[in-house]
Amino acid sequence: MPRAPHSMPLLLLLLLLSSLPQAQAAFPQDPTPLLTSDLQGASPSSWFRGLEDDAVAAELGLDFQRFLTLNRTLLVAARDHVFSFDLQAQEEGEGLVPNKFLTWRSQDMENCAVRGKLTDECYNYIRVLVPWNSQTLLACGTNSFSPMCRSYGITSLQQEGEELSGQARCPFDATQSTVAIFAEGSLYSATAADFQASDAVVYRSLGPQPPLRSAKYDSKWLREPHFVYALEHGEHVYFFFREVSVEDARLGRVQFSRVARVCKRDMGGSPRALDRHWTSFLKLRLNCSVPGDSTFYFDVLQSLTGPVNLHGRSALFGVFTTQTNSIPGSAVCAFYLDDIERGFEGKFKEQRSLDGAWTPVSEDKVPSPRPGSCAGVGAAASFSSSQDLPDDVLLFIKAHPLLDPAVPPATHQPLLTLTSRALLTQVAVDGMAGPHRNTTVLFLGSNDGTVLKVLPPGGQSLGSEPIVLEEIDAYSHARCSGKRSPRAARRIIGLELDTEGHRLFVAFPGCIVYLSLSRCARHGACQRSCLASLDPYCGWHRSRGCMSIRGPGGTDVDLTGNQESTEHGDCQDGATGSQSGPGDSAYGVRRDLSPASASRSIPIPLLLACVAAAFALGASVSGLLVSCACRRANRRRSKDIETPGLPRPLSLRSLARLHGGGPEPPPPPKDGDAAQTPQLYTTFLPPPDGGSPPELACLPTPETTPELPVKHLRASGGPWEWNQNGNNASEGPGRPPRGCSGAGGPAPRVLVRPPPPGCPGQAVEVTTLEELLRYLHGPQPPRKGSEPLASAPFTSRPPASEPGASLFVDSSPMPRDGVPPLRLDVPPEGKRAAPSGRPALSAPAPRLGVGGSRRLPFPTHRAPPGLLTRVPSGGPARYSGGPGRHLLYLGRPEGHRGRSLKRVDVKSPLSPKPPLASPPQPAPHGGHFNF
């Protein structure tokens, strides 16, 4: 394997350092608020929970539903009531007390409970509250899951006319979404039209034009939508919502933010297609995402504002969050209205197969006039009514309501992203803040009860990053909790901005509260603190100090600050950011660092980059050191292996010397000659030239290596016990039992293998490890190639015992698995015993063409390789080999003969030493081999 160059760690380090700033720029960090505050010490009249004599409100709270501001009157829709607040009276210092209210209770609560609904769900929740005209108000409520609508006078809040059906105008359940708006005398509503909320509908009614609706149960039009906002603009009515995506259904239930529109002049289709349905319904995706190589999307629309001036163009501000099962995060994106209108001129998308991807439709397949166009205007100007449109246009718009591409954000990236805080839920925008009415301020509500006041990028700060001016904890558990869970009770579900009254109304499920847009009095007489807050609602007055700015400011308000002017009183050091108390003149200010403090501060990204660089550098240096150490150790180990003449216990070369065969070892190399390393890996097949087998052909293999004995292991007896090789079948009726020879001594069982050419025919009995080591490292006398090998006669060997004899053994300790140490014996030269009818278990497979009596596949003049065979206990077995060849026997001491023998395969040793011939000596009886 090629080694990595030493410069690779440095390249990886440079790549890491170069990627850190890009990663930081790709995903902005959460800004830190300059000022934090809460409503502790605020007047109790700042909250409104409901009527004091309402027992249900005392238990459940307000159950807020919707805000509506008309003619300096704030209308609050809630459970069973609509409250009216005079904003002029509130501005004069009165508390949050309604001057009028209407009560509309459900008369069908008993039937609602019979349907299996809870009592808390059977109240009349006012979900729709829109002005019908300048004098009349339309209110629709759930009415115990039987929605109804009424009209009321705006000033008197008295009912006018009869009740109307609320189906397709108001949802059945208070938890279902709905939006509604009047345009040219007709009510455009979007909600669920049935009890199960399975029929989502965009509906037009209550006007001079015929009622129209969206396609029923068609997921291409609407798929489980959650409607957020409705807007009339130009010739169209726009609906903003989120729904389960149809183009990415393979990813699961992924929600996308959408905007759909219909023509106000739409009269429906012909009887052949889209009769009493919209012929101009189109929708496209709103893209709020962080750009980069891998785009990070905020797909779930939570709230949207009306048109606000942004950089001289009309824009909508929306709050978006991530998917419910994704990393929690929120973002604020703005969309220009002209970009939205331009998006509806994009390409149509279609799905050509059931599991295929959605792709744009080529322009040559789009009929004319362009589907979705308003009749009498633009491309369909030649058609006076939508009912006159061609059928192919109507059928195409029915099957292709989705457009491509998505609408990009106004600044091509979010104005604000938050990933380490609670999720944003609501947004309100003041596009005319400050003394010159040219500053945009965002007010954001979250699901933990906090309100953020934010300057978007490019505002007063003239920077590219948003500035969180203030973070306010607006929730009060004592006033707003009710019977809800703490998490649900803290969620902000409504924001209403009163710029003339310099107030922000915040709605929780159980109450509403109003906040001042600024807290300039906290800066007191500290000019530096007042100006460092960057609050467009605060300014410095020479005589009155830091004061609130409402409307255009006079010449006596200093906005930039005169550094030479005298500061009134002591100022807290803005660099510390400490908050000693509400009375502090610079309570909570964290800006306007002094030059010395700014020079001493270290940016967090730079600190992280330094830590990563130090870690990478240390890892690379450690890797180099470890690599050098391992390389040196390998070089030293290879040098030790190549050095001849050093004794080593039981090394591969020692075994090769012990068991090797063939010619004498070569003489030591001369000076300058490289040492010849013997070949360690060789084959067991004979060489093609018919010569001697390789040097290591007699090396033992893992199968031939005997196992060490175990101390004090007794053999278990039984009538069905077999030996280790399973070959204790009957060997003849006339043979004595196993373990007893004819002379009264134990009969040994041996494994025999003919030696390969060049291997000695004699062996050395080795019973201890010390003897083996002495033999390995002892002197090597010269070999006598023609010296006859001494052998001991085997005529006195007793016959094999009966199969059942091995079942009864003495109680002496046995070696491991009942196998005593092996001994090398010399076979007799006499007559060989008849071969057993059972083939040797250690014989090779017939496929190899070797073994006892099988036909050899190679020429007979070539000596076959030495193989292992089994010899019965009664005498030596037949072995393959010519005359003059000797066998290698594996014997066992006398004291352990007759016991079961574990199968082992031992190859013949090839040793350059002259074999030490010794006849087998009987081991003393009762000898134990406990190692």
From Swiss-Prot:
Any one GO cellular component localisation term in the record: plasma membrane
Signal peptide location: 1-25
Disulphide-bonded residues: C112-C122, C140-C149, C263-C374, C288-C333, C480-C511, C520-C538, C526-C571, C530-C546
Cytoplasmic side: 627-931
GO biological process: one example: nervous system development
Keywords on record: Cell membrane, Developmental protein, Differentiation, Disulfide bond, Glycoprotein, Membrane, Neurogenesis, Signal, Transmembrane, Transmembrane helix
Domain Sema: 31-517
Biased composition (Basic and acidic residues): 893-906
Highest taxon, organism lineage: Eukaryota
UniProt xrefs under InterPro entries: Semap_dom, Semap_dom_sf, Semaphorin, WD40/YVTN_repeat-like_dom_sf
Gene3D superfamilies hit by this protein: ligand-binding face of the semaphorins, domain 2, YVTN repeat-like/Quinoprotein amine dehydrogenase
Subcellular location field: Cell membrane
Chief site of localization: membrane
A molecular function GO annotation: semaphorin receptor binding
Record SUPFAM superfamilies: Plexin repeat, Sema domain
Transmembrane residue ranges: 606-626
PANTHER family the record matches: SEMAPHORIN (PTHR11036), SEMAPHORIN-6C (PTHR11036:SF11)
Protein purpose: May be a stop signal for the dorsal root ganglion neurons in their target areas, and possibly also for other neurons. May also be involved in the maintenance and remodeling of neuronal connections.
Protein name: Semaphorin-6C
Organism: Mus musculus (Mouse)
